[in-house]
């Protein structure tokens, strides 16, 4: 166990000025970060089910990449019992456990040096539709992770969650208007101003804007639940053939955009359709295990935003969520076809979905750089 309660040094320049860029997820990784789930008003049975699931995810990642887990001091003893021994536990306060959204975006340069972008965070909407209050500890998470690695820090003047962007490492950024242009994130910024900031801090050139994310996604439609890059020039889209499903118009509109766009290198995109699970719904038993608090209530019968696109690419391994016995094997087969050179590892992940996200949402990769 190590302690990370120290600030990382803020820089006054921007990554693009310094020759740094966000690499694609398939670039070599030195570590993956996770955070211990503990909110009783978001995770049933005070997080016990989620903690066991996070341990399985950490184990699946650990076969390919070292795992760090931020844990509040009060939960360290419990985490040591539950987590695999290969996981490095780091004492760290947090309001919840979404490392993708509260952790840093690590950028690299041609020499293999790593630095981190620390985005603004307001719990997916602040006082206008946000998911809990307060979020002050979450705002410190990125700094603590960067300090653990000794990386210098850029402080970006933009409210942004890591789950709202995907990049191909070759100049293209994919995102969703439903989230990034939402009035509860950066109401004073225009689309053009947001693009300019992403150019500055991700060092990208071209944007692919999908309108909406997955139906009932409480993050306001994060791209990482809806569509991702598989490799340069290839994307994977969350899909249903059922035209009566509320998801269909969202996926169809996204497909239309993807079919009529090019990436930063001028390539037309190859599009893989990954069938959705379910539809999946929260059960009464699952909803009763969540206590009342400042978090969003978990209601029986509520549709869950389940998606197989919410997987992690880490050092030639795909760690993806198992969500529905009728479609899990189809998803695994499809992923193996898309990634023939990768090991495909499924982890039962309904407990993460019940809390509002999935495997990509609870992980944040640290690129190797060198």
Swiss-Prot record:
Cross-referenced PANTHER family: AGMATINE DEIMINASE-RELATED (PTHR31377:SF0)
A Pfam family recorded for this sequence: PAD_porph
Enzyme class: hydrolase
Domain of life (superkingdom): Bacteria
Coiled coil: none
Organism: Shewanella baltica (strain OS185)
GO biological process terms, semicolon-separated: putrescine biosynthetic process
A single GO molecular function term of this UniProt record: agmatine deiminase activity
Enzymatic reactions: agmatine + H2O = N-carbamoylputrescine + NH4(+)
Record EC number: 3.5.3.12
Taxonomic classification: Bacteria, Pseudomonadati, Pseudomonadota, Gammaproteobacteria, Alteromonadales
Disulfide bonds: none
Active site residues according to the UniProt entry: 361
Family indicated by similarity: Belongs to the agmatine deiminase family.
Sorted UniProt keywords: Hydrolase
Protein name: Putative agmatine deiminase
Annotated InterPro entries: Agmatine_deiminase, Peptidyl-Arg-deiminase_porph
